[in-house]
């Protein structure tokens, strides 16, 4: 099984775009526990964003994005996630934007790797009024490590457009990075970086790339609840200037742990 997973990782690396402001999260390697489900609500409000319709895509300025995510642990190292994306703008009202499916596999603990390692593949549809990519595939390797109170995670994400406004010349490179420190027993503070460099064979010009930095708080050591929240600041003209995100999750264990 070990070699099949490694081969799958190698193949996926040769395919796939950054998260838009619907699900803003740097993944950890741990999959959802077997026979348990986590119900998550991602609430992201754009205080300062795009104000014009660009390539048929509606503005993000003062948009409220609510995403429902449901993830179930199938085995000790495999989970399946479902997303429902919604958008509210005062001039357009409330809209359902699309849905995604995301299977994820994690390396077994018995391998005793020095880092956590998992791989997710996310595929789905978004309305052309809210995304330049109507059908897309995302491959997300996840590498993380805990050193006592310090935590770091790297998601060197690749995205491929299956259908969209314009043809995509190559997979897009969209890395995500998280670093945090547990200043308190149950609370950590840290930073999250979200990038979108553009196609691998020809990165976008620097002002056209997406780069954002979030200052975040995480709830720790709670088997039932997950909380991640904080403001994000766009670092380039192509990135929304100010977004505030709140992620609240509730785990349900269908059988005794």
Predicted features and spans:
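Bacterial Sec-dependent N-terminal signal peptides
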Residues: 1-22
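Transmembrane beta-barrel domains of Gram-negative outer membranes and organellar outer membranes
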Residues: 18-257
């Amino acid at each position: 099984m070990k070699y099949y997973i490694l081969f799958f990782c190698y193949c996926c690396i040769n395919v796939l775009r950054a998260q838009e402001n619907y699900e803003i999260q740097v993944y950890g390697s741990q999959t959802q526990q077997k026979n348990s489900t986590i119900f998550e609500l991602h609430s992201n409000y754009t205080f300062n964003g795009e104000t014009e319709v660009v390539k048929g895509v509606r503005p993000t300025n003062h948009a409220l994005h609510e995403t429902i995510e449901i993830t179930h642990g199938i085995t000790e190292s495999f989970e399946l996630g479902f997303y429902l994306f919604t958008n509210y703008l005062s001039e357009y009202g409330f809209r359902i934007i699309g849905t995604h499916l995301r299977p994820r596999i994690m390396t077994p603990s018995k391998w005793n790797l020095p880092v956590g390692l998992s791989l997710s593949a996310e595929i789905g549809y978004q309305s052309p009024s809210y995304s330049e990519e109507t059908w897309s595939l995302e491959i997300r390797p996840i590498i993380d490590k805990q050193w006592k109170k310090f935590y770091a995670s790297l998601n060197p994400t690749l995205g491929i457009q299956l259908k969209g406004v314009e043809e995509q010349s190559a997979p897009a490179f969209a890395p995500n990075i998280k670093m945090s420190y547990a200043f308190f027993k149950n609370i950590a503070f840290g930073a999250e970086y979200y990038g979108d460099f553009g196609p691998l064979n020809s990165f976008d010009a620097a002002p056209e790339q997406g780069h954002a930095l979030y200052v975040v708080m995480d709830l720790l050591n709670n088997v039932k609840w997950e909380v991640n929240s904080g403001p994000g600041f766009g670092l380039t003209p192509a990135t929304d200037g100010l977004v505030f995100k709140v992620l609240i999750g509730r785990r349900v264990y269908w059988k005794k742990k």
